């Protein structure tokens, strides 16, 4: 269909099931049977009102297994259902065998959607046994016990740029000193095991996290003598090398650019984009970006979203599933029903707004 390019999908390891969200609805496609299931949507069949088109919410897929079972969450304003009118994070599981979804947890917050969505993008992860949900919110890292509705604030007052999370890989990393430009220990926690791994540097160096590629942590190392913090808001942390590591402490890849430095980066699926600068007599100047592709990215070429341009349909989005679908073939469409977990109600907790401990500015336009 015709959509924006800001789309993501997830699949199981066997590439049998593909889940994707578009226009406020979550869909699951099963190859082979060619069944397309609407897993979740606020939209009503046959009629629309303001609640259908209000888009201050977002669907995020956490994981999907080889049977098509899925964990996903909805963050932001709740257009309908029992939480209608509230703002928060609802965590659901989908059972492919019964074509049904179950709400496991609802977290009520006071944070605006634009900020909440960024927090959940950083980390919103449910443990494999469905007993714990981990969330970053307003500079704090929370462990929510779904079995007894308890909330534990593991870390608080985390500064911007001092922590990163992986919702798909179940990992969380934070600078021990909590100083973006002056930290020498970076801790990595496996949320399934609770084990921590510490990464350190030499005394004349400092560390900074960049992000995650799946469950692998990406961070950079800079020399203290190169770091420029004189102009507030224009600080430069020039990393002379970038490392990709796993939770066992093993270095999977080391990137050391020649004649330039890395000052930041972003991860889009399996592609790591690095922003770079060169050092001149007048300071640091921008230079070309560089990219690191995950080793499995080549295997992904037959899957994912592709874009076709035409005068009639403009930019059309196509989901590649690795199978050939004859033109004119229409998938069987199913609609999931919502059920309660047997003998239990969904856990509900509320996290109050926190007083900001650092000045933050958000650019809206």
Regions from the PLM with identified roles:
Residues 2-10, 46-65, 109-125, 157-168, ...:
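Repeated scaffold domains used in trafficking and secretory/extracellular systems
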Residues 16-20, 70-74, 270-276:
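Short, hydrophobic/proline-enriched secondary-structure or compact coil segments at domain edges
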Residues 59-80, 86-93:
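N-terminal non-globular leader segments, chiefly Sec-dependent signal peptides
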Residues 1-3, 25-54, 82-115, 136-156, ...:
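Surface-exposed loop/turn elements that mediate protein-protein interactions on large endomembrane-trafficking
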Residues 2-24:
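Beta-strand-rich domains and repeat architectures in extracellular enzymes and scaffolds
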Residues 24, 76-78, 139, 178, ...:
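Residue-level signature of beta-propeller blades and closely related beta-rich strand-turn architectures
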Residues 164-167, 171-175, 180-181, 207-232, ...:
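Loop/turn-rich, solvent-exposed surfaces of beta-rich toroidal or solenoidal domains
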Residues 18, 70-72, 132-133, 172-173, ...:
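Hydrophobic beta-strand positions that form the internal "hydrophobic ladder"
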